[in-house]
Amino acid sequence: MNHKSSKGISNWLFAVILITPLIIVVGGFAFFQYQKRVVPAETSKIETKKEDAKIEEKKPEIIRPTSLGLNTLFFGDVFWGRYVDDWSKASDLKFAYPFSGLNTFQRENYQAWIADLECPITSTYINSATQDNLLKFSCPVGYTAEAAKWFNAFTLANNHMDNMQEVDGLKQTRDNLDVNKIQYFGHYDNSFRDATGRDEICEIVSFKSKPVFPEIKDNQIKMDSEFLIPVAMCGYHNVFKLPTEADLAVITEYSKYLPTIIMPHQGQEYKTVADSLQETYYRKMIDLGADAVIGDHTHSVQNTEAYKGKLIVYSMGNFIFDQQTAPLYRQGIGVNLDFNFFMDENLKKWSELAVNCTGFKDNCLAEAKMQKLIKPKFSLKVDLIPTDNSNKLAKKADEDVATKILKQAKWAETKTKLDYSYAGK
């Protein structure tokens, strides 16, 4: 046996035995240090996922409105034919001229403007002298797009809407309003019925509302949606022929289901006090369920009345018109009806249905009956805003003129007798 080899092997084994524990200790220490770095990172990822899950669980609560506001302003006769057209052509503003003073009414405070369109809109041009001599009106199409920046709906129930029937003036008018997304209601003939027997007196029109929300708290957001409100509007042309009982009965079909506003065209021109026929028929409209009657035609402001607590305006007078010879013809009133509809399941369904209530002769009322909807609950504030068409431009009346107009309308007496408390029950 080689003693040198035996001794070398012994030394090698001794070295292995000596080094192995050291390797184990060093390796263990290194692994421990690695774990210190890696495990917290993995734990951190897990914790982050948990936090993300918690955040997802805390999605903001969507809050519905507690009520829907609808601030409306009604005006009298609107007309851009005859001399209004001449003034506009002479102005740098052209088609925008007749409406250039309307910003004095702070349009942004209202959801809807409604007026009487006292002229068919047609492509047939008639000069101002001929319109004046014949009292036959035709309003140029070009103004309609400008009107749409201000007005949401027009009544067509008046004594000039049939002036251009040889060129199908009523249809042209409706077509032009449709193109510009202006709603309309009423017919120059109350007795007209279509092939199905349906009248064209009343329509359900829909307006964008102003939603009213409760105080929004942390982790809550307002419902981001457009809420529409439907309102029944009826136009009656009573100048040459008074409405029949059947014509008037149409009001009840709508007033059972919706706030219903009547815009009759009646009375002796240039008178400041309503005649007995106006009183009889306008009061009858209230008896049939109308929530307000807002008249025009006389080209003058007439008295107002609270009948059974409800508003009757016998005539609003001119608004945008070309009669300039006396203050009587230049002055008018805007009627401010400020609604607040109380949100409940019934109103929610009405608002959803209202999307389909913007077209002429739609099936909105029939659909409401099918859904068994009832008249929404609402509160109503009423005010008069005097208007002034002097210097050939419609605008809000100054304080002195406004005082005279309100006195002529007997507004101080009327407003104390209005009572719309029934509407919220």
Labelled PLM ranges:
Residues 124-147, 258-290:
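Active-site-proximal segments of metal-dependent phosphoesterases and phosphodiesterases across multiple
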Residues 81-83, 121-123, 159-171, 191-201, ...:
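Active-site environment of divalent metal-dependent phosphoester hydrolases
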Residues 110-122, 158-159, 230-233, 254-273:
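Short acidic, glycine-rich surface-loop motifs adjacent to enzyme active sites
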